[in-house]
Amino acid sequence: MGHTVVLPNSFDKPLQEERMKKLGSDEHRKWKAKMLRAQGKKVAVSDAVLVLNFEKHGQLNYIGGATFLEIFKAFELGKKIFLYNPIPENFLKDELLGMGPIVINGDLRLVV
């Protein structure tokens, strides 16, 4: 496919956020701000964003707050936005539709 992948924050430390929460709200807030700034920079240097929106917490095609912000940053910067699965049926649906993501329904060949 010829794509270079930029991994999301904490990819190699999936439980880091839970550890930061245990350190207290101030430490967690500082860590979260640092992660959000870092992710914005990653989106800025990328051609597109591919969101792997799988089931989580019992919700199909889950997109959390931080991921929504990444999608918005990509939209703001004019980047392509790909969703692995359809847009979730939740309170962010209209906003997500407005950003015009390309739903690939699991077909990675559509990421071009």
Residue ranges: model-predicted function:
Residues 1-112:
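Conserved catalytic or regulatory cores that recognize and/or transform ribose-phosphate-containing ligands
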